[in-house]
C-alpha cells in the first residue's frame, strides 16, 4: 500500500510542523508586545526616557533626520493629541503636576489647556438637564371637576398623593420651566377643616397647571378683629423672603375652583379668578366685585401700594382694592362664567369677623388713602414659621384696630 504524496512541493515535512512554527512566532510577537507595554508602564508619562529604556539612541540636535525633521524635539516620541511633557531641568524644585480631570471640573474653561491629556472638551455633567419653557396652556388639564365636601380628608394621605410637593408646600415642574412663579396667600384663623379640603383639591390642580408655586397660610394670632387685607400684605412680604415670586394669588380658604382651566396665575391685567361662585348662583354679584380669589403680578401689587390695612372685620377691602386698580389705570380680567365656577364651603360667620360698619366710608376715600395706607404703612410681628409638608404656616401679630 502506497502513501499519498504531499499536496505541496518542496519539503516533505508533516503539516503539524508548519503549525508548530506559526505558534512559536505568535508567542514571540506576544512577548514583544508585553515587553513594550511594560516599558510604557515603567516610563509613565515621561516619554522622553522611552528611547533609553528600549535601547534606542536619539539623533543629535542638529540632525535633519528623525524627529527633528518633523519639528519635534529630538529623542521624543509624541502620541497624536497628547501635549509634550515639560522639559527636564537641573533643579531641586519639584515639577508642577499636570492638571487632573477633577481640576478641569473645578475650574472649567473653554477646552483642554497645556499639559492636559484630553483631546476634547470634558463632557458636561448629566445631573443638569436643559429644559424648555412650559407651554402657555398645560396639556395636563382635565376641565370640569366634581367638588364635594362630604368626605373626610386625611392630610397624611394627601401628602402621599402629592409626592412631588416639597416641604413648605413648594412645587416646581420636573419636565419644563414654568414662567409663572406663584405664591398663593391664604388669610387664616381657626379654619383647619376648610384648609384640609383646600389642600386636597388645589395641590393636584396647581401641578396640572404646571406652576412653580408655594402655599403660604398667614395665621392671625390673638382674638382681635380679623383683618383679611392686612394678612394678605404680610403674606406678600413674607413669601418674597423665600423665593423670587413674580405672581401672587390671594385666596380665601373656603373657595375651590370647579375647572382646572381656571389657572391660578397672573395676566397682563389683574385677574379675578372666583367669578361664578355657587353662593351667588354661579354669577358675578356686581361688576366691581373682586373678592374670593384674585391674582396680581408683583409689579401690579406694588403699583397700588398693596392692600389697605385699616379694614377690620368683614367686607369692604375687596372693593377698595378694585378702586386702587382703577385709579392706576388697570382693568380686571376674568375667565368666562363656565370656566370660572367655584364652590364655597358653607359655614357660619366667624367670631371677631362681623361686618365692618366703617367700610362704606373707607371705600369712598380710597383715592385719598391708597398712597399712605398699604405696604408702606404695614406693621406686624412674625411669631412663628412652620414648614409643613403641604404648606407653610406663618403666625403673625398684626395688632388691633386703632
From Swiss-Prot:
Glycans are attached at residues 90, 117. Pathway: Protein modification; protein glycosylation. Residues 77-130 are annotated as: Disordered. Residues 45-402 are lumenal. GO terms for molecular function: alpha-tubulin binding; beta-N-acetylglucosaminylglycopeptide beta-1,4-galactosyltransferase activity; beta-tubulin binding; identical protein binding; lactose synthase activity; manganese ion binding; N-acetyllactosamine synthase activity; UDP-galactosyltransferase activity. Residues 116-130 have a biased composition (Polar residues). The soluble form derives from the membrane forms by proteolytic processing. The keyword Metal-binding applies. GO terms for biological process: acute inflammatory response; angiogenesis involved in wound healing; binding of sperm to zona pellucida; cell adhesion; development of secondary sexual characteristics; epithelial cell development; epithelial cell proliferation; extracellular matrix organization. Keywords: Cell membrane, Cell projection, Disulfide bond, Glycoprotein, Glycosyltransferase, Golgi apparatus, Lipid metabolism, Manganese, Membrane, Metal-binding, Secreted, Signal-anchor, Transferase, Transmembrane, Transmembrane helix. The chain crosses the membrane at residues 25-44. InterPro entries: Galactosyl_T, Galactosyl_T_C, Galactosyl_T_N, Nucleotide-diphossugar_trans. Mn(2+) binds at residues 254, 347. Its EC number is 2.4.1.-, 2.4.1.38, 2.4.1.22, 2.4.1.90. UDP-alpha-D-galactose binds at residues 187-191, 226-228, 253-254, 314, 347-349. It catalyses: D-glucose + UDP-alpha-D-galactose = lactose + UDP + H(+); an N-acetyl-beta-D-glucosaminyl derivative + UDP-alpha-D-galactose = a beta-D-galactosyl-(1->4)-N-acetyl-beta-D-glucosaminyl derivative + UDP + H(+); N-acetyl-D-glucosamine + UDP-alpha-D-galactose = beta-D-galactosyl-(1->4)-N-acetyl-D-glucosamine + UDP + H(+); a beta-D-GlcNAc-(1->3)-beta-D-Gal-(1->4)-beta-D-Glc-(1<->1)-Cer(d18:1(4E)) + UDP-alpha-D-galactose = a neolactoside nLc4Cer(d18:1(4E)) + UDP + H(+). Residues 1-24 are cytoplasmic. N-acetyl-D-glucosamine binds at residues 316-319, 359. Gene3D superfamilies: Spore Coat Polysaccharide Biosynthesis Protein SpsA, Chain A. GO terms for cellular component: basolateral plasma membrane; brush border membrane; desmosome; external side of plasma membrane; extracellular space; filopodium; Golgi apparatus; Golgi cisterna membrane. Signal peptide: none annotated. Homodimer; and heterodimer with alpha-lactalbumin to form lactose synthase. Interacts (via N-terminal cytoplasmic domain) with UBE2Q1 (via N-terminus); the interaction is direct. PANTHER family: BETA-1,4-GALACTOSYLTRANSFERASE (PTHR19300), BETA-1,4-GALACTOSYLTRANSFERASE 1 (PTHR19300:SF5). Belongs to the glycosyltransferase 7 family. This is Beta-1,4-galactosyltransferase 1.
Amino acid at each position: 500500500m502506497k502513501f499519498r504524496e504531499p499536496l505541496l512541493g518542496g519539503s516533505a515535512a508533516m503539516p503539524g510542523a508548519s503549525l508548530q512554527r506559526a505558534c512559536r512566532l505568535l508567542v514571540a510577537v506576544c512577548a514583544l508586545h508585553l515587553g513594550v507595554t511594560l516599558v510604557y508602564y515603567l516610563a509613565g508619562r515621561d516619554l522622553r526616557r522611552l528611547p533609553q529604556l528600549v535601547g534606542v539612541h536619539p539623533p543629535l540636535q542638529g540632525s535633519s533626520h528623525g524627529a527633528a525633521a518633523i519639528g519635534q524635539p529630538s529623542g521624543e516620541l509624541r502620541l497624536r493629541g497628547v501635549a509634550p511633557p515639560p522639559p527636564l531641568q537641573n533643579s531641586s524644585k519639584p515639577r508642577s503636576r499636570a492638571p487632573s480631570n477633577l481640576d478641569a471640573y473645578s475650574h472649567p474653561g473653554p477646552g483642554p489647556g497645556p499639559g492636559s491629556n484630553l483631546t476634547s472638551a470634558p463632557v458636561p455633567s448629566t445631573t443638569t438637564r436643559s429644559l424648555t419653557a412650559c407651554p402657555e396652556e398645560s396639556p395636563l388639564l382635565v376641565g370640569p371637576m366634581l367638588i364635594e365636601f362630604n368626605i373626610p380628608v386625611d392630610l397624611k394621605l394627601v401628602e402621599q398623593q402629592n409626592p412631588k410637593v416639597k416641604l413648605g408646600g413648594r412645587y416646581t415642574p420636573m419636565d419644563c420651566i414654568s414662567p409663572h412663579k406663584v405664591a398663593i396667600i391664604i388669610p387664616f384663623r381657626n379654619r383647619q377643616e376648610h384648609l384640609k379640603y383646600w389642600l386636597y383639591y388645589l395641590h393636584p390642580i396647581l401641578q396640572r397647571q404646571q406652576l412653580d408655586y408655594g402655599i403660604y397660610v398667614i395665621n392671625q394670632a390673638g382674638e382681635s378683629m380679623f383683618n383679611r387685607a392686612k394678612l394678605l400684605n404680610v403674606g406678600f412680604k413674607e413669601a418674597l423672603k423665600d423665593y423670587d415670586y413674580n405672581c401672587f394669588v390671594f385666596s380665601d380658604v373656603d373657595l375651590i375652583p370647579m375647572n382646572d382651566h381656571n389657572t391660578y396665575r397672573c395676566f397682563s391685567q389683574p385677574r379675578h379668578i372666583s367669578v361664578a361662585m355657587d353662593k351667588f348662583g354661579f354669577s358675578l354679584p356686581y361688576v366691581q366685585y373682586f373678592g374670593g380669589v384674585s391674582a396680581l403680578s408683583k409689579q401690579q401689587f406694588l403699583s397700588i401700594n398693596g392692600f389697605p390695612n385699616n379694614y377690620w372685620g368683614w367686607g369692604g377691602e375687596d372693593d377698595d382694592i378694585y378702586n386702587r386698580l382703577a385709579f392706576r389705570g388697570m382693568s380686571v380680567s376674568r375667565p368666562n362664567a363656565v370656566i370660572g365656577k367655584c364652590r364655597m364651603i358653607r359655614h357660619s360667620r366667624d367670631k371677631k369677623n362681623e361686618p365692618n360698619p366703617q367700610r362704606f366710608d373707607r371705600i369712598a376715600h380710597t383715592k385719598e388713602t391708597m398712597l399712605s395706607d398699604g405696604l408702606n404703612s404695614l406693621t406686624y410681628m412674625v411669631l412663628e414659621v412652620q414648614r409643613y409638608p403641604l404648606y407653610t404656616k406663618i403666625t403673625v401679630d398684626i395688632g388691633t384696630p386703632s
